[in-house]
Amino acid sequence: MSSRFAGGNAYQRDTGRTQLFGPADGSNSLDDNVSSALGSTDKLDYSQSTLASLESQSEEQMGAMGQRIKALKSLSLKMGDEIRGSNQTIDQLGDTFHNTSVKLKRTFGNMMEMARRSGISIKTWLIIFFMVGVLFFWVWIT
């Protein structure tokens, strides 16, 4: 190791090294042991029974996948119908709330107009309604 860094050039790159992750001596030992399945010279010979077996397995798996796809399609169609129905229900509920709001505003306006025309203040009307409420509550609990 001391001979490698001799002469004070420890900061310089080793000129014999050409690969980042290869050995330091420059040999290409990784390529010697690598074998490829595509580059092999062994001939693979499948018999007709093996090929038929593989094909039948493939057809079975394709059939099962087809059934699963049909089930998913059916499920997604049912989900779409449910979502559309829910959206219609929500729209109807919104319309109902709007109509109720309009009716309550109109009723409150009519009540305020009635109170103004009668000459009795709103405080008096509130006291009367409170007394009637207390009377109903008293009858309810006894």
Curated annotation (Swiss-Prot):
Biased composition (Polar residues): 26-36
GO biological process: endoplasmic reticulum to Golgi vesicle-mediated transport; intracellular protein transport; retrograde vesicle-mediated transport, Golgi to endoplasmic reticulum; vesicle fusion; vesicle fusion with Golgi apparatus
Protein name: Protein transport protein BET1
GO cellular component: COPII-coated ER to Golgi transport vesicle; endoplasmic reticulum membrane; Golgi membrane; membrane; SNARE complex
The protein's assembly and partners: Component of a SNARE complex consisting of SED5, BOS1, BET1 and SEC22 or YKT6. Interacts with SEC24.
Keywords assigned by UniProt, alphabetized: Coiled coil, Endoplasmic reticulum, ER-Golgi transport, Golgi apparatus, Membrane, Protein transport, Transmembrane, Transmembrane helix, Transport
Cross-referenced PROSITE patterns: T_SNARE
Membrane topology qualifier: Single-pass type IV membrane protein
Positions in the Vesicular compartment: 142
Protein family (similarity comment): Belongs to the BET1 family.
Main subcellular location: Golgi
Function: SNARE required for targeting and fusion of ER-derived transport vesicles with the Golgi complex.
Residue span, t-SNARE coiled-coil homology domain: 52-114
Residue intervals annotated with topology Cytoplasmic: 1-117
Region (Disordered): 1-36
Gene (UniProt): BET1
